[in-house]
Amino acid sequence: MVDCVVKNWQGEEVGQATLNLRVAKEESAAHIVHRSLRLQMANNRQGTASTKTRSEVRGGGRKPWRQKGTGRARAGSIRSPLWRGGGVIFGPKPRDYSHKMNRKEKRLALSTAFQSRSEDLIVIEDLSEQFTKPKTKELVQAITRWGIDIQAKIVLVLPEKQENVYLSGRNIAKLKIILANNLNIYDILAADKIIATVTAIAKIQEVYGNET
């Protein structure tokens, strides 16, 4: 269980939020988080890289010159891998890089990773009333008031899609906005700081807290 300070729009402390997620045992936590991260990164690979072998490259059916008598090295095809424009030896072919992992394991890895980042977590009051229209400058100033360097990699977790908040944040280079029901382990681990609204924390707690 972790108690997090809740900050308002001005950056003042106004309360506390409790994060009590189901986490993996200490001896297996690193392994399960690593497996889940590897799964996500592997599943994101397109696997479409492709090269042609000497049998697939067009042309090269005729022997370039006779076997003996020219003084040149023997050659059987202009599409040999030794030649410019020839085939590729052991080059990549389209393949499926995806892995599988049990659903319960993935959820456990995600909740373990999120709770492990509690020291870098900033909980704030809901933003819906603060953005009647998109305003990047106001969001940048608020992030600074919350004690975060705007040059850091930041993940902002919202409970639901809020168009004005999204439009305000999309021009901030290292800010990524995700929804509480779209959490993923890569963004959680890659971020320098995580900002989450009180309602988003409640949603995460509802989904990942004390899961049986």
Curated annotation (Swiss-Prot):
Record flagged with keyword Mitochondrion: no
Gene3D superfamilies in the cross-refs: 3.40.1370.10
InterPro entries assigned to the protein according to its UniProt record, in alphabetical order: Ribosomal_uL4 (IPR002136), Ribosomal_uL4-like (IPR013005), Ribosomal_uL4_dom_sf (IPR023574)
A molecular function GO annotation: rRNA binding
Keywords assigned: Ribonucleoprotein, Ribosomal protein, RNA-binding, rRNA-binding
Domain of life: Bacteria
Annotated stretches, region: Disordered: 43-77
Keyword Glycosyltransferase: no
GO cellular component: ribonucleoprotein complex; ribosome
Positions in coiled-coil regions: none
GO biological process, one term: translation
Basic residues bias locations: 60-71
Biased composition (Polar residues): 43-52
One Pfam family here: Ribosomal_L4
Membership in a protein family: Belongs to the universal ribosomal protein uL4 family.
Subunit structure: Part of the 50S ribosomal subunit.
Biological function: One of the primary rRNA binding proteins, this protein initially binds near the 5'-end of the 23S rRNA. It is important during the early stages of 50S assembly. It makes multiple contacts with different domains of the 23S rRNA in the assembled 50S subunit and ribosome.
Stored HAMAP family: Ribosomal_uL4_B (MF_01328_B)
Name of the protein in its database record: Large ribosomal subunit protein uL4
Organism per entry: Trichodesmium erythraeum (strain IMS101)
